[in-house]
Curated annotation (Swiss-Prot):
Protein's name according to its UniProt entry: Cilia- and flagella-associated protein 99
Start-end of Polar residues biased regions: 217-227
Record's GO cellular component terms: motile cilium
Lineage: Eukaryota, Metazoa, Chordata, Craniata, Vertebrata
UniProtKB keywords: Cell projection, Cilium, Coiled coil, Flagellum
InterPro entries from the UniProt entry: CFAP99
Length: 646
């Protein structure tokens, strides 16, 4: 029994490895034959015969085993699927060839409970004559099924039933253990008066706490960086106040006209002597270091900024020279400048108002477009519903045509399966012949490769022997050379090696001397350039201070202009945009009323639209207030504006 059990286990193991979707049966059998070469010839032939039969009649066996799992084998594992297929194949195709006694030995070598369930299900006369016969007749001819498979199974059914009864008796005798008398439970009374003594808890160990670090004194003191920032802020504010006071005192001194009849001699020198310098260094304070440059500039930035400030200084000096030489009064120019600035400011306000009104107009047009889009969407939805109904009808017709074509295809497949066995036999013979030819061709290739490898090995041995013979020959290792002797090849400028070395040493010395001189020149040039850059940085700092004062004056002037109220604009473009906005709003209200009438479900209030309308109204009011403030502030010019114009 152990012998047959090992054979059946080998077949089951090989069947578990087979995957119908991925593996080819012929190739799988060849691979299995190569893996089973370690077995004896008799055992190998039996395993391969059963394995090939299970693969060939896999459809028939799968029908029976799947039905067994559905009805009687619900509690059986899916791992035993291949085991049931092998038993079904042996009972159907090899029972007469093996003999009933050998079949009984094979059945007894397997698990008894599983075999009893499966054989009772498979050899049930009701199952064999009804659905098993019908299912097998769908795959093969009904006459062939009844004559070769169903009738032999029905003849063997009584003997198999005796085998099943015998196996059930054996399993019942093995599984019935000796029944022992159960021990009676003896109840015990509860002892409620004697409480359990309380356990004394173990003392907890006192944790050892590390000594904490003292709080640093810097925690209770303000940081040094904050103190330094406060110091710098106070110094900068004091310096700005001094510069503003000095600018207000010396205001418009350079713009005073002189008589044209007075002759000017040395205008630049007289100006420098007559007027004090506009920019003076403030005295050093004890709490601030003015040499601390906050921004580090590279050479290119310093030169560029220095050239810019130099051009500005030259232009300012030229303008002062023209004024000193007798230029006219600037009152007319100031009046014209004020008018042009007021006109430019009004144009800017009108342009900003136009932009705001255009935004509001685009909003109204967007609302109109959204309403028209809603109407178009309703029409499009109705069209899509009609198209969907047509598509559903077409789909139903297409399904009917597909069902008819599928039935025709099933009939064609059934007819093609009748000739499948002959085609498979022919295909197997062709594949065996192809494999034999490939094996012979590979043998020839291996022989040719072995001959080529032997020839290559022989050639390498000859080369190695020749190299070893060359290595054994004596060679002259040294050569006598006179370094002071001229070779005498007849070349121009020919010299000995000693002379060549001396000349090379002299050339290196000259080159080193030239490099040192060039290095000294570079260092001197860098020093000069750094000094010039330092002077230019000081000049740039002075010019920046002057520019800062002028920027502060312009900022004060802009603040004064922004704080003044402005009058409402009367521009034609603004009026036209307002009229268009009112027309669009009226049109939008008319369309909304039409939509409310046509679709009563959408007549509920829209809080989002109300919020948008309120937002636009508040934005328009704030814009009008700002325009009034700006226009009222443009009428009153100050001394700072005249200074900027000069």
């Amino acid at each position: 029994m152990a012998y047959y059990g090992k054979c059946i286990e080998t077949v089951i193991e090989q069947l578990d490895k087979f995957t119908p979707k991925r593996d080819n049966p012929e190739q799988f059998l060849e691979a299995a034959a190569t893996s089973l070469q370690a077995l004896s010839p008799q055992k190998q032939s039996f395993v391969l015969e059963v394995l090939s039969g299970c693969l060939e009649y896999r459809k028939l066996l799968t029908v029976v085993v799947d039905a067994f799992y559905v009805e009687d084998g619900r509690l059986c594992l899916r791992v035993d699927h291949s085991r049931f297929e092998v038993i079904c194949y042996l009972a159907t195709f090899l029972l007469e060839e093996l003999g009933f006694q050998l079949f009984c030995n094979i059945i007894k070598s397997q698990p008894v409970d599983k075999m009893c369930k499966f054989l009772r299900f498979f050899f049930n006369p009701l199952h064999l004559c009804s659905w098993i016969k019908d299912e097998w007749s769908l795959i093969y001819e009904p006459a062939h099924v009844k004559e070769n498979w169903i009738d032999p199974l029905m003849r063997w059914q009584p003997e198999v039933q005796e085998l099943i009864n015998h196996l059930e008796g054996v399993s019942a005798s093995q599984s019935s253990p000796l029944k022992t008398k159960a021990k009676v439970t003896e109840p015990k009374e509860f002892n409620l008066t004697a409480p359990r003594p309380r356990t004394i808890p173990a003392p907890e160990p006192v944790p050892v706490v590390a000594k904490p670090r003292p709080v640093p004194q810097s925690t209770y003191q303000p940081p040094k960086e904050q103190q330094q920032l406060e110091t710098v802020k106070r110094y900068n504010r004091r310096k700005a106040e001094e510069l503003l006071l000095r600018a207000n005192i010396e205001e418009l001194r350079c713009a005073m006209p002189r008589s044209c009849r007075e002759r000017v001699q040395g205008s630049k020198q007289q100006l420098r002597l007559q007027f004090p310098p506009r920019i003076r260094k403030t005295p050093k304070l004890t709490f601030y270091r003015p040499d601390n440059i906050l921004v580090k500039l590279n050479t290119t930035a310093i030169l560029r900024e220095g050239a810019l400030y130099q051009r500005q200084v030259e232009q300012e000096l030229q303008r002062v020279d023209k004024l000193v030489d007798g230029a006219g009064d600037f009152s007319e120019f100031f009046e014209w400048q004020k008018k042009m600035q007021a006109k430019d400011r009004e144009e800017q306000l009108a342009a900003s108002e136009c932009r705001r009104l255009q935004g509001k107009l685009s909003h109204e047009e967007a609302v109109l477009a959204r309403q028209s889009l809603m109407q178009e969407n309703k029409q499009r939805v109705e069209q899509q519903k009609e198209q969907m109904a047509k598509l559903m009808l077409q789909r139903a017709e297409r399904r009917l045509r597909e069902d008819r074509s599928r039935k025709e295809l099933v009939e064609q497949v059934i007819e093609g399966q009748k000739n499948a066995k002959a085609a498979q036999t022919k295909l197997a013979k062709g594949r065996q012949q192809t494999v034999q030819e490939a094996i012979e061709e590979s043998r020839g290739l291996l022989q040719r490769r072995a001959q080529a490898a032997q020839e290559e090995q022989r050639r390498r041995c000859e080369l190695i022997s020749q190299l070893r013979a060359l290595e054994t020959q004596p060679t002259r290792k040294g050569k006598l050379v006179d370094l002071t002797q001229i070779p005498g090849y007849g070349l121009e400028g020919e010299m000995s090696i000693v002379e060549l070395r001396e000349r090379l040493a002299l050339l290196k010395e000259n080159q080193r001397r030239k490099e040192e001189e060039k290095r000294d020149q570079i260092i001197q040039g860098k020093h000069t350039k750094s000094q010039e850059l330092q002077n230019m940085v000081e000049q740039i700092s002075l010019c920046r201070a002057a520019m800062g004062r002028s920027a502060a004056l312009r900022w004060e002037e802009k603040k004064a202009l922004a704080a003044a109220p402005a009058a409402p604009s009367q521009d034609e473009r603004v009026q036209q945009l307002r009229r268009r906005i009112s027309e669009r709003a009226a049109e939008r209200s008319r369309q909304a009323a039409l939509l409310h009438v046509s679709a009563p479900r959408t007549a509920r209030p829209k809080p989002r639209a109300q919020l948008e309308a309120q937002h636009w109204l508040e934005l328009e009011r704030s814009r009008e207030r700002r325009l009034q403030a700006l226009q009222q502030g443009g009428s009153g010019p100050g001394p700072a504006r005249r200074l900027e114009a000069a």
